[in-house]
Amino acid sequence: MANPVYKILTEGAFIEARRKGHFLGSADDLRDGFIHLSLADQLDGTLAKHYAGQGGLLLLAFDPARLGAELRWEPSRGGALFPHLYAPLDLAAMLWVEPLELGKSGAHRLPKRIAA
């Protein structure tokens, strides 16, 4: 299996996605026309830029092979290639979900299973 791709969701958004079986996107995703995903080594930057100090977040891991041809790798922050999904995010492709805890500094702590 290829390295997982990750999506950060609020608990509420995850509950709704689980009810539907898929996630259609956040306001930013809908504005940009695709679902923003990250690789493990991109998560710290994504969390710092878009979710600084925000609690109640979950980290979802997905198998990129199960997301299909609508998963594209495109330049984004600093020219790095990021995974962008041009389709609903199917929860059937989810490998696992874990809470993102906030440390005392206000920075998020990634789950131990991630080797970023």
Predicted segments with their positions:
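Conserved, structured core segments of small domains
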Residues: M1-A116
